[in-house]
């Protein structure tokens, strides 16, 4: 009984830490997005081997954000991060149209996992500043996001991670939907 009361007190008084995982194919901009939230500035990144984790506070909410490596050899391990996830941020390189079908398959397989049944989905159509980048509506169609309607809360936003454009709106959507 004491443990239950301690947990209730901690979540009410101290506040819950919401778990967010950031997934996407390699070179989509996941790490750039994570560190933009942490430093509010552009940082130089290198391919993530395994994961990066940081805590970010926004509007009196505390997020633990896991940036998970997107190389093909690492994608099978994504499911080890799903437990108790509140939000999944899916980062898409909107300028790399040839790899959208790969991410579509990854996304739809991922969403069948029982640990993500209650997780909200935020798709960030990154690299909107690059020539030939698909807009968010085109990315949504290519990923088949319309099939998610009614099943769970989801949103797609355009962004440019290196400039920080669209990232505050993404956090705002998360904060408003938790």
Curated annotation (Swiss-Prot):
CDD domains the UniProt entry points to: Arl5_Arl8 (cd04153)
Alphabetic keyword roster: ER-Golgi transport, Golgi apparatus, GTP-binding, Lipoprotein, Myristate, Nucleotide-binding, Protein transport, Transport
Protein's UniProt keywords contain NAD: no
Q: Which domain of life is it from?
A: Eukaryota
Q: Summarize where GTP binds, as residue positions.
A: 24-31, 67-71, 126-129
**Cellular localization per UniProt:** Golgi apparatus
Q: Where is the lipid attached (N-myristoyl glycine)?
A: 2
GO molecular function list: GTP binding; GTPase activity
UniProt keyword Nucleotide-binding present: yes
GO CC, sorted alphabetically, is:
cytoplasm; trans-Golgi network
What InterPro entries does its record include?
Answer: P-loop_NTPase (IPR027417), Small_GTP-bd (IPR005225), Small_GTPase_ARF (IPR024156), Small_GTPase_ARF/SAR (IPR006689)
Instruction: Give the knockout phenotype.
Output: RNAi-mediated knockdown results in disrupted clearance of intracellular pathogen N.parisii from intestinal cells.
GO BP term (any one): intracellular protein transport
Query: What Pfam families does the annotation carry?
Result: Arf (PF00025)
Q: What does this protein do?
A: GTP-binding protein that may be involved in protein trafficking; may modulate vesicle budding and uncoating within the Golgi apparatus. Plays a role in the shedding of pathogen spores from intestinal cells.
Give the family, as the similarity comment puts it.
Belongs to the small GTPase superfamily. Arf family.
Q: What is this protein called?
A: ADP-ribosylation factor-like protein 5
* Lineage, highest ranks first: Eukaryota, Metazoa, Ecdysozoa, Nematoda, Chromadorea
Q: Which gene encodes it?
A: arl-5
